Amino acid sequence: LVNTKISNNIKFNEMPGGANVVIAIASYTGYNQEDSIIFNKNSLQRGIFNSAYYRTYIEYIENDESFSIPDINTRKSGHNYNKLETNGIIQNNSYVNDTDIIIGKTSKIDGKIIDKSITIHHHDFGVVDGIFSSNNDTSNNFCKVRIRMERIPTVADKFASRHGIKGVVGLIIPQEDMPFTSDGIVPDLIINPHGIPSRMSTGHLLEAITGKTCSLLGTTYDGSPYENYNEFDNITKILQYHDFEMYGNETLYNGFTGDQFSSSIFMGCQFYQRLKHMVHDKIQSRDVGPKTLLERQPAKGKVRGGGLRIGEMERDSLISHGVSKF
């Protein structure tokens, strides 16, 4: 709703990284402390902030290697080879998870056929979005498979406004438990008021009430800096003309009890961005998995299917909680 000249020049509206949302700045349920955000579950179900995440897998073949379906006697256990075509490559538009083979590859070593087939990353899933391959004598033979994953926002995903007010999702609650106005307007997300004064992000508040006027008038607004002198007075007059409080404050009611809140709550329309920091890519844990040859200890690193090391201080925390076995 609120643009700048630079955002128009770089065609930001044609491929935005977020959506316009109704925000409320309030302390609610205690789950939006420390910059965390409370999300409206029904807004997520309607598709807000849904995104597509692409991951590409590429594999080359060298001497004595080929793309093919491995013999049943040499296959890796616990994996599904049924989605491969005769050339050893998965079918396009197939749904895959971390047990499906996407590229069948065999290698001949000392007269033995070794299975070197490729799966997608652990806990990943999605649809095969594109397949690119080269199989000629003039270049390296390769196969590239692109997987498209639908990412729905969940707890611990990160979001931010265009003014540096960033935070992770702390709680997702149904719409009927969210605060609401007398007109039935329910915010899409609730941010904490304690993150505003010390950061002095005045533009964050100005964009919210400007977006509110834009939604009432059905238009957009040029919010370029160092322009529109005294425009704040015009914005407040528009809000008053439409029977809203001039500074964007509204009377809200508790979604759990229906009681009116004792204080007014700031509400407005604002553009929020979904950031690339998603919990699906960062969460790390293991139950069973590979061990190192030398120490017989769990492997190190998320890529290897390893766990997090329990150091001295972590051990002390477990003992303080009364853990006798681990």
Task: List each model region and its residues.
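Long insertion/accessory domains within large nucleic-acid-processing enzymes
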Residues: 1-326
